Curated annotation (Swiss-Prot):
EC number of the protein: 1.1.1.61
Cofactor(s) needed by this chain: Fe(2+); Cu(2+)
Organism: Clostridium kluyveri (strain ATCC 8527 / DSM 555 / NBRC 12016 / NCIMB 10680 / K1)
Gene name linked to the record: 4hbD
PROSITE patterns associated with the record: ADH_IRON_2
Binding site for Fe cation: D182, H186, H253, H267
Record protein name field: 4-hydroxybutyrate dehydrogenase
UniProt entry tagged with the keyword NADP: no
Signal sequence interval, chain numbering: none
Pfam families assigned: ADH_Fe_C (PF25137), Fe-ADH (PF00465)
InterPro entries: ADH_Fe/GldA, ADH_Fe_C, ADH_Fe_CS, Alcohol_dehydrogenase_Fe
Amino acid sequence: MKLLKLAPDVYKFDTAEEFMKYFKVGKGDFILTNEFLYKPFLEKFNDGADAVFQEKYGLGEPSDEMINNIIKDIGDKQYNRIIAVGGGSVIDIAKILSLKYTDDSLDLFEGKVPLVKNKELIIVPTTCGTGSEVTNVSVAELKRRHTKKGIASDELYATYAVLVPEFIKGLPYKFFVTSSVDALIHATEAYVSPNANPYTDMFSVKAMELILNGYMQMVEKGNDYRVEIIEDFVIGSNYAGIAFGNAGVGAVHALSYPIGGNYHVPHGEANYLFFTEIFKTYYEKNPNGKIKDVNKLLAGILKCDESEAYDSLSQLLDKLLSRKPLREYGMKEEEIETFADSVIEGQQRLLVNNYEPFSREDIVNTYKKLY
């Protein structure tokens, strides 16, 4: 039984300048990033690399159409390295760009063509949530299928994962919270996954501690205090990525995908809507497994009784990021059934990682409670 894989070499630099100079970014490199990152942080240190801004191809979550249009614009140009500097959307797209190109990226996500890596991939995350710099997963909205779908393959691992706290310090508050909540959920779902083991647990627990303790300090000292402890979130997110990259995530992510895909809710925010409700259901189904350890861990960090762990967690997170019923994002009541079918049909890759199996009825009931 394989216990742990950490495929990329992990680097950390204080500044973008240090990163650009160390990796000698220049001719033969393709940088995928955002203009608001490129202009202040990267442009003056770029020695001839082609730079493309992801937002030119559309806003929000990555999609198969976005990927197709970028590949079309690349045309016959040949690159040695793909360098992703950005959040989850940039990273997910860059992973696909590191592969041998196909006419339609939908074929990759639907398994119709093989994944063949033919370029080095350097990932520099600029949010503190995806952990995607150390995972072999890429997720995109499939426009023609009206859902989000992920593919997992070792061909998608980065060659180098590079942590640069300078990027995170300027992250707008809303993006900081939604991305770091996503990291917390990665760590927690990975901890209760049937694929978890002592190695992944070590990364999960430390990630949960770093992120939750950081949140508690922010509530006490103000939201701007996050800049003082930003490395805790950067490292915590990376640890969470290592955990879920090996153990997987489950129902929280699976049920959130139709919401994110159809109503363009940011990924971390969509996950947060389902987080505590699904873990309460897990506990009702089987209170004696690892969910008991999660409750104990949360209670210790949040200084509450184990029976109040999820309520206390919700109270803490609600102070940082407000939640709304699903209907306020645009979801229609009749979509409860269709979304449940969509999850069962398209998200088995995630559902197999559930702490306890979720029936169609469980999925429908979860949507109803949150509607």
